[in-house]
Amino acid sequence: MNSPLIIIRGAPGAGKSSLGRNLKKKFPSAALLELDNFRGMMNVDWTDEQQHRIALKAAALAAKTFCEQGITPVIVVDMFLPEQLNYFLAEAGEINYRIISLLADETTFEKRLAERKEGFIDLEKTIEINEQLRKNPAAHETIIDTSGKTKQEISGMISAK
């Protein structure tokens, strides 16, 4: 994994945050940026697309700064629907990146969302997001089906690629 920027995208419950945390542990100078944390810095309205764009821009600038200072890889976690991904990459500038897209089946999402104590738990919207990502792959992305997989299995799958 030689890219200074690793983008992990997927629907809620796909395993993005867990993979991001596990990957960060594997690199001595990595940084982990979760868009939910950037959004949470505001009086967040989770349905407000303008707030999401502000958070995307802030995260892109943070990622760019970390990379410029040699803090790599920078692992960025969000849903990253196509328009959001394009906006983030434009704001981040000319940084080599790798995209990892996590997809899963409905049964897996149902189980994972039911286990959540907080956060996004709308199964119907989650499945819709998952299908958008499945139907609109990013160029040169690595797609991982996390259906029925544990956090450790998902981390092992990406380490092997």
What kind of feature is each model-predicted range?
Residues I8:
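Hydrophobic anchor at the beta1->P-loop junction of P-loop NTPases
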Residues G93-L113:
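Conserved phosphate-donor/acceptor-positioning beta-strand/loop module used by diverse small-molecule
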Residues E118-M157:
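Small-molecule kinase domains that catalyze NTP-dependent phosphoryl transfer to phosphate-bearing small molecules
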Residues N2-L5, I71:
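Pre-Walker A (Motif I) flank of P-loop NTPase domains
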Residues I54-E94:
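Glycine-rich phosphate-binding loop used to anchor ATP phosphates in small-molecule kinases
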Residues G20-K64:
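Conserved substrate/cofactor phosphate-moiety recognition/catalytic segment
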Residues K16:
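Conserved lysine of the Walker
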Residues G13:
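Walker A (P-loop) phosphate-binding loop of P-loop NTPases
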